[in-house]
Structure formats: C-alpha cells, structure tokens
Amino acid sequence: ARCGLLTGMHTGHAQIRANDEMTARGDVWNHEAMLRDSTLEGQAPLKAGTPTLGSVMRQGGYRTAMIGKWGVGGPATESTPNKMGFDEYFGCICQRQAHCYYPPFLWENDRRIYLDNELLPPGTPLDEGADPLDPHSYDKYTQQTYSPDIMYDRVLRFVNENRERPFFLMWTTPIPHSPMQAPDEMVQYYVEKFGDEAPIEGKGYFPSRWPHATYAAMITYFDRQVGGLVAELKRLGIWDDTIIVVTSDNGPASNSCSSTEWFQSAHPFRSGKGWVKSS
C-alpha cells in the first residue's frame, strides 16, 4: 500500500507486494542487533530512480518532506526518503521500529537521532508474576519521549520554515497502528467514559491494561494534531492555499490489540485490513 501511494502504481504493477523484511541480511527481528547495526533496518526497497510523489512535487518546484514511517527501503539501500524525492525526512525508516511509540532513536535524513528512551523490543511481556489488572504492571511500556510528539513538532517546523514558498509534506504518522500506547491523561479520559475492560496480551506488540480506551486516546491524539496543524496554517495565513488529504494505507486492523468490531471501524462494512465486502 505504501508503494502504491508513493508511486501511483496499481497494486498489480507495484514493485513491492508485501512487507518483505529481507531476512537474508541477518536477524532482522532482533531489535538489539538492529540498534547496533543499521543495515538490518528497513524493508524491501523501491528501485533506484523510481518516480514518487516526492520527486514529482520537487520537480514541480515544491519543497518536499516526509515525516513519519517510511517502510520501503532501509538506510543501506538506494531507497531512502532523501534519495526518493524528499528534501527532508524525520521519522522511522523501518516499520519494525514503528512498532514501539517510545523508540531509542529516529532518523533525521541520513543520521540517527537518539532519544531518551531505552530499547524495549515489541513483544516484551509483563514481568513474571505481574498482576495484569494492576495498571502499574504496565509502567515500563511508557517512557520519556513519545515519538508522535516530536514528529508533530517537525511537522509544524517544516510548515513554518516554508510558509513563503510552495511545499509538499507527506506526514505518515504511525498512529493508530499497534501497539496500544498513548499519553496517560488521554487514556484515563476514555477509561472514565468506557468503564473497566479486560486487558490484552498484545501478541507481537505490547500488553495494554485498557486497549479500547488507549485506541480511542490515540485517535483523539491524532485528531488534535490535525486540528493544531490547521490552526497553524490559518495563523500563518496560508490555509486558503493549502490542500490537506487524510487517508489510510489499509482498512481497519486489530493486530490482536484493538477491536475493530467493538469500534465498528469498517461500519457499515464487514472485515477489515486485507479485504472488505458489503454487509
């Protein structure tokens, strides 16, 4: 889907058909190894020179940026945002790294920017003997720097720095993809609205004490960010000259973390990511 969105190619003609992790490189699912060796980051790359939204807009005279998840190439390939038409990039090159909202680092163009978070590999379970009903059992899954916060700061910075000229920004926020992680004050707001609920193990991601409340908090968080961006565009006097498109890269997905049925995410349709048919 990311390949199709970036290149405009129909899925049947797209270069990338799946999340190819290129496992021949080594133990790509070992996050400690990936922290030590950046060549293990990233997924199957686009071919060098492939036209993208970024390159086409840059040729048209726009300053281009991508902020967020890349996932179609890695630092050691010819398919990085900067090589694929984006003047500026900030975010997570590798989609596996995006499976934690408190990562130890992000990428700024071609270099890592280290954050004040410790590595906590996705799939890390609760401590042995921890009570899954005790909110404090989940404390280790919340760290210092919430990556959507600093991505959003870069969004506002880019808009401000380029307010006097044409710009194209592709903001590929990881929200609301699993795992379920959101600022606690927003989570508690929905805990009060929804009431108590069963925790989840978060298979392959992280456990969550309040998965429905956390998912709702993530949606609200992103909604507020979009509202803040609109307000900033108006403050800068460029709102009337700006086009905003909000889209998803796939249908609703639970990923064993949030309930698409409970939220009626595809309503009035059934199913979700992968296929949808009318009810």
Feature roles, as predicted:
Residues A1-S279:
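Formylglycine-dependent sulfatase
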